[in-house]
Amino acid sequence: MDKETIKAHKISDEEYAQILEILGREPNLLELGVISAMWSEHCSYKSSKKYLNGFPTKAPWVIQGPGENAGVIDIGQGMAAVFKVESHNHPSFIEPFAGAATGVGGILRDVFTMGARVVAGLNSLKFGDIHDEKCGKHQKYLVKGVVNGISHYGNCMGVPTIGGECAFDECFNGNILVNAFALGVCKSEDIFYAKAEGVGNPVIYVGSKTGRDGLGGAVMASDSFNEESKSLRPTVQIGDPFSEKLLMEACLELFKTDYIVGIQDMGAAGLTSSSFEMAGRSGSGMKLYLDKTPMRESGMTPYELMLSESQERMLICAKKGYEDKVIEIFKKWDLDAVVMGEVTNTGKMELFWHDELVGLIPIEPLSEKAPILSRPTSEPKYLSEIKNYKFELKSSVQELFIQMLQNENINNKAFIYDQFDSSVQTNTIKADGRLGASVIRIKENGASVAMAIECNSRLNYVNSKIGAALAVASAGRKVACTGAKPLAISDCLNYGNPQNPEVMWQFAQGCEGIKEACKELNTPVVSGNVSLYNETEGVSIYPSPTIVSVGVLEDANKTLKASFEKENLSVYLLGESLGEFSGSMVMKIQDKKVSGSLKELDYKAELALWDLLYKANQNSLLECANSVGIGGIAMTLAKMFAISSVGANLTSDFDDEKMIFDESASRAIIGLSKENEEAFLNLAKEFGVKAYKLGVSTSQKHFKLDSIELSKAELDKLYFESFKEQIQ
């Protein structure tokens, strides 16, 4: 094998030596391609696995933790929620519409492959500076393309996209982040797993035909960008949501039978990863007859068939004798379905082309025992330069308030979420635009499931460990503010180039923060994804661990809003304000800096707040609640009253006027009627949570917070109209 071919497959000299040892000979091109894909960062998690192993993954309500297509938790009365978040960053930067669309398609397949009907989607989007003279126009193009791709796929599939977050920062100028989350619901006893066992059991290919799109996608997603990356468009897969809709319905019909042993979607590395993962998890071997693959293009080679990432395809291990019945279901839905192999006990993948053996590879070294790297780490040098920076006000709070409310990181994103169908399936209780977590009704048991997606990249830049822990806490707090109990998380860890020791240090610290927070807050990790190499021309993104928290409220009718719908409601701030301005939005807007050093998270205070919100809502004491986040109580209150029909007369009583922009954790704003105040304050005392009265909601169309005063019309214009103008 010549060195250029090996290099083109991103195989190092050390890895090639391992390949020679595993095979006992030189690989052929097909085998090299397969091993390259399975050992890519995207498929093997070789740089990250050692840090992920310490995550807490168990709890009485966890049915399935990491290692399957998606995580599963018990949501009561025999029902389960199946969910996962993952990235499609690199493809979305190269081809925003197709990249984002297939990102949605991939995560939907991960969920319905487990036997669940998908009932909700969320997304976390990070773009570059839309005001930048050089790249602003391109960033707007990316925003529009990505949003269009997500809405097209989700809407066509009939899956409601009910929430998300969108942030902008120059650190994403060269690498945008597109993280998609999906949640499905099924009976706890009806979950299907990705396994291939039972010697002689048939392996069946179902779904769309295989083309050349997406070739080398897993390897491409395991590398950083440079000038040549513009030619990578052919590696972006093309999605067809209508085919996926048929595939989902066919799979859900199949799941009502007892015809199959296991099922796996063909995602990154296509047929390669699905076959190796199924056999690897089961300790089996497999024979695949590649010439039987349904092909969209003529003249395709075994190499192309094994590595194509054409969308809307699944691999099924059926019970012997049931092949025809499985095929009949997929034919009914107008999809391809062919027996293309069988399970063996050899522990090897045997690849045939017109009955000739063209590839023979041991499965375990590519799946369960793929190489794990221990990359060097070193604390980033910039941390010593930024840690002592202190924020001081340089302009009036009214001026800053206006600048912040109309900033693209805070203002309303109706331009984005209006393109998503959030009400299809008629289960949505609280969707995008209503602040905080999104909520769906589970008709089968009367409960509701709340979900929130969260990542503040600036905080992770300032302190990677505490920043990641804060993402876990913040996502959970948003769920708690709906009245639900946070139960578990899914994570999508977006970082720069792992070959840079400083990036690897950030990653290790981020994992430590997630591990600590999940343990202390009792929200185990049940699924996730790692996206590395988010770097262009040597510049990495800020560390961005996206966290989705999922919780359950036993009675869907008790779901809390985040808006004040009545006058004369008492407005309270819960939790302590500690003056946290490090990495804050007010610092970024006023000083154009991301600096400081974060305070440790007080887990007891965070949990006490969650427990108080849950108990107070169970006792019907609250009218509304919202987590305090970016921009402090100033922005939280502004947004709550912007989406409300009433005005506000509020006083913070802070000694320092800048404290309204403080971003301390473990805080929430609540609204309650005066007759419930005493009972609530007694309860807050019981839980050890400080409650500070800020004022009341009023019938006057006016917003007042300390020295800040605006008419309701001015407030609404700043919040609702700004982004539409900025994105044009």
From Swiss-Prot:
Q: Which SUPFAM superfamilies match?
A: PurM C-terminal domain-like, PurM N-terminal domain-like
Could you name the active-site residues?
H42, H88 (proton acceptor)
Binding-site list for Mg(2+) 1: E86, N529
What Enzyme Commission number(s) appear in the record?
A: 6.3.5.3
CDD domains per the record? PurL_repeat1, PurL_repeat2
Keyword Ligase present in the record's keywords: the answer is yes
User: Which UniProt keywords are given for this protein, alphabetically ordered?
Assistant: ATP-binding, Cytoplasm, Ligase, Magnesium, Metal-binding, Nucleotide-binding, Purine biosynthesis
InterPro entries according to UniProt = PRibForGlyAmidine_synth_PurL, PurL_linker, PurM-like_C_dom, PurM-like_C_sf, PurM-like_N, PurM-like_N_sf
Q: Quote the catalytic activity from the record.
A: N(2)-formyl-N(1)-(5-phospho-beta-D-ribosyl)glycinamide + L-glutamine + ATP + H2O = 2-formamido-N(1)-(5-O-phospho-beta-D-ribosyl)acetamidine + L-glutamate + ADP + phosphate + H(+)
Give the binding site residues for Mg(2+) 2.
Answer: D110, D265
Q: Where does substrate bind?
A: S87, H88, N89, H90, R109, Q237, E309, S310, Q311, S531
Signal sequence bounds = none
* Enzyme kind, highest EC tier: ligase
NCBIfam families linked: FGAM_synth_II, PRK01213.1
User: In UniProt terms, what function does this protein have?
Assistant: Part of the phosphoribosylformylglycinamidine synthase complex involved in the purines biosynthetic pathway. Catalyzes the ATP-dependent conversion of formylglycinamide ribonucleotide (FGAR) and glutamine to yield formylglycinamidine ribonucleotide (FGAM) and glutamate. The FGAM synthase complex is composed of three subunits. PurQ produces an ammonia molecule by converting glutamine to glutamate. PurL transfers the ammonia molecule to FGAR to form FGAM in an ATP-dependent manner.
Name under which the protein is recorded: Phosphoribosylformylglycinamidine synthase subunit PurL
